Amino acid sequence: GNTADNKNIESAADMKQKKKRSPYLETLSLDGVHWHCRAVEFFDVTDWNNNLVAERDFIPYRRTGYRGNLLFARDGRDGNGFFFLKEAPCSSVQLGYPGSDFVCEFGNFTVSGIGASEADLKSSDWVKLYSCVTGVFGEGELSPLKALRAYQKNIREHRPERDEMIMMNTWGDRSQDSKVNEVFCLAELEKAARLGVTHFQIDDGWQEGKSPNSSVAKGSFRNIWDNPLYWTPAKDKYPHGLAPVVEKAKELGIELGLWFNPSVQNDFEDWEKDVEAVVKLYREYGIRVFKIDGLSIQTKKAETNLRKFFDTVLEKTD
């Protein structure tokens, strides 16, 4: 209804009523009623979303939920503050989502949504939930960003040769997979080198199997392993395999990357086969950079199996 019709908007008794609480990751109760907050929400599914970040500034009052993976809160009295980083997928695709990520009421702040339902939790199994990081910062606009960056640097060693890149992707010419082949890639590599590109990533179309986005044949993201040759170079496009393209890239000082889509059916039950496909490409061609696409994580089991896929690939490669 119309919010103007709300009753007891300033009733002290109404403000003290206890609200039903969902499972939460973290909560803080701090002094002061003049907190200035900013919630930052991110969006994936970039086929549909072109605006990938949304910020909302607010001063907490009545108990209200906000969406996002980041919450910055600054005390209006002295300028110091803290942040919550909810380590989880974007709000729109989280599992067991309670409708918001942060619940704020005056100086009370809670991170909600653990990434699982009651049915997902079993005494016999370890179930990984979403996590939360709390950090503090001082005055100034740069201070919270430096605090957040300090945490990120601590959890992952920065290696320029691995983490810094200028990538060129073959999908950008709007031809889908119709032009991708050995001759095309060799020519594109020459252009990429002139542009200073460090990584050349061949998107959908390099492989023998066909995806539903193929312009040359009707394919699917499901039941990929019905075709055991799905993740091998397409013979009609790459008659010599990927070796000539890999060698050309090395000559030009460019690293070659590939598109890869894990088999999604039955909660990624074929994750071990997907691991072997990626590891084989790494060992045969030295491919280290993969664009992972087409993910659909709708259950906790799917999330668990996908995590096994990523972790096992890391274990089997150096």
Describe each region flagged by the PLM.
Residues 164-300, 306:
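Aromatic-lined carbohydrate-binding/catalytic grooves of carbohydrate-active enzymes
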